[in-house]
C-alpha cells in the first residue's frame, strides 16, 4: 500500500506539468474575455454578411467560414474542455509498442497526445502526436519500455485546451499462472523447458557461474539442513508443506507444479531424473527472466504457498542491469533498471505468515524513512558488490555458508567476514557516560556500551530465529577473567540465555500454544529482539572489582554472530557442527587502572 501511495504522488507531480493552457482569445470575437452567445452571433453575422473568407472565424482551419465553425464554438461554450477519451489496449513484444484508443468525436479537435511516464526511471514525455481524428492506434518501433509504466492520451482543441483520459498502467509481459488453495500452481504458461541450465551460461559468464556455484542460491537444493526443515514441514502439513518450501527454495519446481515430496534428502533429489534446472535450486534464469516487480508473500492460516513471480522465460531474452548491452549470438539482452533495486529480492526475501513477520528482510529495508522513495542503499550494493571490472559479484554474500565444508575453506568466507565487519560499530559510551580511566579495587565498575547498526536491515535478518547474535563482554586482570557475559568455549557451545546481563539480539517464533518453534509455517507470533537498521542499543554492566585486584584491568566487548544456533545442527546434522562459524562483527578494548 505504501509503495502504491508513493507511485500516485509521483504521478500527480508528473501530470501537473503536462497540460496545455487554453487560449480563450480564439473565438472571443467581441473581445469581452468570455466565450458566450455574443460570440456565436458575431460568427453567424460574419458568415451571413461577409462574402470573403476570414481566418479569424475559421475555428477548424478548413479555410471556410461555415456552420462547422458555429458547431465548434457552441460545443466549447457548452463544455469548456475537449471530450475525454481513453487508451483501450497496450501490447509490447520487447521491440514494438502498440497502443490503441477510442476515437475522439470532439468538434474542436486539433490533435492527440500520447503521454508516457515511468516510475523507476522517472522518464516523462509525449511519445506520439497525431492531428488526424480518425487515428486510433500506433505502432512504435524499437521502444525500450521499462517496468511500471503509465500512459494516458489527451485531446487538444482549437483553443489549446487539453483533456487527459484516465491513466493506463502497463507492466512488461510475463507468463501467468494461478495458485489453488493448497499452493499448487495450475493454468500455468510456464514449463520446465522454458528455463536454461546455469551451466549453459558458464561459457560466456565464467566468473559469474563460479560465484553462483559457491552461493547459497546454488546451495538451496544441496543443503541437508534445508531438507531437514522441509521433511518436518511436510510431515506436519502434508497438503501444503512441499510448495510452502519450494516457492522460494526452488521457484522453478513451484512454478511448474513439480512435486518434490518424495525427495527427502540431497542425495535422493540429485540422483533423480528431475531436470537439472530443478536440481540447481535457484539458477540464473530464476532472476534473469524477471520482467516485473513481485510482492511480499502473505501466507494465511493454511500455510499454502502463494508466491507470485513475474517471469518471461523461454523467449530467448535475458534481462539485467546493463544499459545498452552488447549483442551476442546466444540470446537477446534487455536492460531493466529494477535489477539494481531492492525490489528484485522479492518475493523470496519477504515472508509473512498469519500476519507474523517471520522473514521480512525487504520490509526492514523498505521501512527506513526515505529509502524506497528516494533510492537508499539497495540490497545489491552490499550483497552483490561491484568488482574492479565493473561486473557484480554473484555470490550473493550473506550470513550463511555451505555447512558441508569447513568454513575456513569456503571461498565465500572472507567475503562474509568483510560484510559482517561493515554492519555495526560499538563504543564504551552511553549518552556521555564513559568508562573511567581509574577505579579503586573493591568498587563497582560501570561499563556503558552502545551498539549501533550501520546496515540497511535488521541484525539478524532473514531466518533470524535460527541465529545467535550477542555481545561478549570480558573483564580481565593479568590474563585472568574476572567477569564475563556471553563467553563461549567453542563455536558449538550453547549460549546462556539465562544470563540476565547477556545483551542478545535473538528472535523467537511462537507456535499456537505460545511455545518457541523454528517451523516458519507454524508461526503464530514472534518475539523480535533484533537491532533495527541504523538503530542503537544501549547496555550498562555493573561489575564488582575484587579487593585483591591491582594494576591494570582490560575490558573487551565483541559483537558476535552465529548463523545457526547449534542445537538444531547437533540434533539433525552433528557432523556439521565443526563447520559452523562465529563471526566477530566488531571489537573494542579499553584499559583501566586499578588503585
Features from the language model and the residues they span:
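Sec-dependent N-terminal signal peptides
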Residues: 4-20
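Cellulosome-associated attachment modules in secreted, modular CAZymes
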Residues: 19-86, 106
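Extracellular acidic, Ser/Thr/Pro-rich low-complexity tracts
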Residues: 48-49, 104-108, 157, 453, ...
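Pro/Thr/Ser/Gly-rich low-complexity, intrinsically disordered linker/stalk tracts
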Residues: 81-108, 145, 158-177
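Recognizes extended acidic, P/S/T-rich segments that occur
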Residues: 111-146, 158-165
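Short, surface-exposed loop/turn segments at beta-strand-coil junctions that are enriched for proline
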Residues: 143, 544-550
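Hydrophobic beta-strand segments within extracellular beta-sandwich modules
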Residues: 151-153, 555
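Primarily the internal scaffold of c-type cytochrome electron-transfer domains
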Residues: 175-192, 209-236, 261-516, 520-522, ...
